[in-house]
Structures are given as C-alpha cells and as structure tokens.
C-alpha cells in the first residue's frame, strides 16, 4: 500500500553555485525526469526551499527503498548535482492534495 513521504534533497559537490538552477548541467534531462515522475503520480508536489540549497518533494510510494531506487535514476544524481538527505513518512493532517 502506498503512503506519503517527505523527501529532502540537497545540492552536491558538482553543483555550480555561480549558475542558476536552470543553467546547471543536464537541467532539461533532470526537469523531464521529474516531470515524468509527477505525471505518473509518484511525485505529488515539490520544489526548491528558498534561501537554502535544499528541495522538498512529497512522494507517494510503498517505502523508502522504492523512493531511493527511483530517484537514483535522476540525471542530476548520476552527475553528482543532487543527493537525498532525508526520506520520512508523512501524514497529511491539514488541507488536501486534491
């Protein structure tokens, strides 16, 4: 049975801090990969946490291992631009995701 998880990612060693996110190496491949995960319902919502090197994803999955496995295919992870820092089961108690 699937459930929700809060996942945080952070910029890794290969991140070029002189460039904006959209100009990082393989931006288009990363964006297409994430868009596909969102289109299939794996990624529910997500985006950068302003003022930090981190991003937050809300993911629907069976377990943390599934998340790690799926996200390991991200072109930015393979290039060393991103790393997952936390995968935590999350319960939505206020509002809705539609």
Model region roles, listed by residue range:
Residues 1-98:
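Conserved, structured core segments of small domains
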